[in-house]
Amino acid sequence: MSVVGIDLGFQSCYVAVARAGGIETIANEYSDRCTPACISFGPKNRSIGAAAKSQVISNAKNTVQGFKRFHGRAFSDPFVEAEKSNLAYDIVQLPTGLTGIKVKYMEEERNFTTEQVTAMLLSKLKETAESVLKKPVVDCVVSVPCFYTDAERRSVMDATQIAGLNCLRLMNETTAVALAYGIYKQDLPALEEKPRNVVFVDMGHSSYQVSVCAFNRGKLKVLATAFDTTLGGRKFDEVLVNHFCEEFGKKYKLDIKSKIRALLRLSQECEKLKKLMSANASDLPLSIECFMNDVDVSGTMNRGKFLEMCDDLLARVEPPLRSVLEQAKLRKEDIYAVEIVGGATRIPAVKEKISKFFGKELSTTLNADEAVTRGCALQCAILSPAFKVREFSITDVVPYSISLRWNSPAEEGSSDCEVFTKNHSAPFSKVLTFYRKEPFTLEAYYSSPQDLPYPDPAIAQFLVQKVTPQSDGSSSKVKVKVRVNVHGIFSVSSASLVEVLKFEENEEPMETDQNAKEEEKMQVDQEEPHAEEQQQQTPAENKAESEEMETSQAASKDKKMDQPPQAKKAKVKTSTVDLPIENQLLWQIDREMLNLYIENEGKMIMQDKLKKERNDAKNAVEEYVYEMRDKLSGEYEKFVSEDDRNSFTLKLEDTENWLYEDGEDQPKQVYVDKLAELKNLGQPIKMRFQESEERPKLFEELGKQIQQYMKVISSFKNKEDQYDHLDAADMLKVEKSTNEAMEWMNNKLNLQNKQSLTVDPVVKAKEIEAKIKELMSVCGPIISKPKPKVEPPKEEQKNAEQNGPVDGQGDSPGPQAAEQGTDTAVPSDSDKKLPEMDID
């Protein structure tokens, strides 16, 4: 089973796998561990990753990048509206209202959903992993920003399904970093000791995330998270782009923003300049040849001036740091270390701001680029039964408070309740109790829209169906289980109706006197049982933490509810009936459409494969033309007649011209047939050359074998001691085989020496190899027969002398022993061992 972690970044992606030796980040076909999050659409196929990145300028309108933040967002979303101006490609409103990406693919206009585009990238990463692992990749853990909402998370989950992946967990990026940090630490405090608090700062290309985590041995608990969803490396790039657009506009009278290709070129150069300034404080040049209208442009920038222009961005670094400490109720002195990851944390001013806030040196023990994917791979290994991993419990948090709202006819309106507070432990389940006579709807939403980086606070609506009153007409007790799962997605996972079957001793039904009051109320399980359980959990139990949280929470609630005071105990028999739930999720893709996307992705993968095979076949023809043309005037020259060489050379030239004219775009089979046609002419020449290279070596080896056996025959005839044990009849066989081999070799050598090199050889290398094997199989076993061993003479008296006294020493045997003689001697070894042989 494969164990894969995927860091799905805004600008670039990484894939890591768990192997016997640990976690390894995989390199792609370009030997680069970083794969650009980029897809380019062409008339025949798609290019994904590094191949697509090279087409960003040449195929700007059909090359898609920066699409990660469109997940689960409507076309009318303010964020999408703001992003439009930064995109070289077109985005459109889909029939569902979501954001679509418009490109020209296979010579026709196509609209793709964000899920489809992300699935294309995931398919490429999957292919990269499979090429290294040499086996199928299905199970994986994928990273998402910690600030993603339900709709965005479900959108990414749909993308993994379209790509044919089974996502075991959507893991928050900061949590993945914390896992990569903590699982290898050997000096963490014990479970009963005060935890070690570590802050993780992740500033990538598009966003800025901070989390504070508490570590104990074998345990990681996220305490709080904070973020700035738009502060990242690209904001610093934009500062440079805007500066040079203004400067070049004045200096060269160019309107750069009117030409998307010019703007893309400038953006690429500014990103390079930004990275250079991180390591160099002096003035650095920026030069672009033939930038616009055949005009060469140039400018300079230094770190000091750049930081002045970025003052407003740098001011946004501190608030999330302060927020995360306030949420976790920690002081700066409580922080053990501050670990930084992400490409933008390499900017010296950013590091300085973070270090100054905490008043301590920053820690850089993790790989800034690969920490997230390594954490995801570790989580996948923990979840996989195929790997034995050190026990490590992971408790994440709910980033936003979640509430439920339901209709309350008795109160002529609606009621609501906050079921998960901000920074509540996750994964987690709660059981809510309602009293209802008919089906009802629960509406889930985020309680604090002002904290949400998303325009719509709604999560979903859940219709609990088939709710009926009790047989006496009273309200039924309905237990509803709500859950935030390992992906951070909220759901009403189950609902059940408690049906009263029988009342004994003519007593009133339990809770009947309260039914009128509780008609439209609900009960929420308290969270204390979970907290107690967390303290009592052993590391072994922590591995199944999410399930234990849910089970114990529900069980403890039932225990409380079902154990009223003994004096008022009502003897009732009840049964539980599961109720169907109809989900109406925000921006959810329906199953039928998802299957269609899966089918389309399969077709596109096949089209890419066919295109690659066609290109490989075409390249093989071109490669063969160049190879044979060079060798015909080189090492193959004396193995082909002049007429044949001239005609073959002409054929090669015709093929080369055909490749760039009529044969430029042909089906794969045409190239395969063309290559076979050329090889029919070239293969005999190649064979003659190879035979001429191998034949002398093999004849030499055969001659050595014959010479060796002739020496043995001569030694045997001279009756040398070394071979005097060999049988004369066998040696006659050796002599006969050796003479025959010598005669065969001399005959073939004479014939071959008379043969021209431009025709096929008289004898081939494989025939000589067969003759060598034949000779060795006959002669080898005979001459290598070992001499028989000569047994040394036995010393018969030795044992007898050692059995009795030596030189008169030792006790004499008694009279009885003397009379018995050897019949009463000490039992022999075989006699001693005999009883043991009877024991099973």
From Swiss-Prot:
Where is the stretch described as Disordered? 506-575, 782-840
**Residues recorded with modification Phosphotyrosine:** Y89, Y336, Y660
Q: Name one GO biological process term.
A: protein folding
CDD domains with a match to the protein in the record:
ASKHA_NBD_HSP70_HSPA4
Per the record, the major location class is: cytoplasm
Any idea which residues bear Phosphoserine here? S76, S393, S415, S546, S647, S756
List GO molecular-function terms, semicolon-separated. adenyl-nucleotide exchange factor activity; ATP binding; ATP-dependent protein folding chaperone
Q: Tell me yes or no: is DNA-binding among this UniProt entry's keywords.
A: no
Q: Which residues carry the post-translational modification N6-acetyllysine, per the record?
A: K53, K430, K679
Q: What PANTHER family does UniProt report for this protein, alphabetically?
A: HEAT SHOCK 70 KDA PROTEIN 4, HSC70CB, ISOFORM G-RELATED
Query: Can you state the subunit structure given in the record?
Result: Interacts with TJP1/ZO-1.
What is the protein name for this chain? Heat shock 70 kDa protein 4
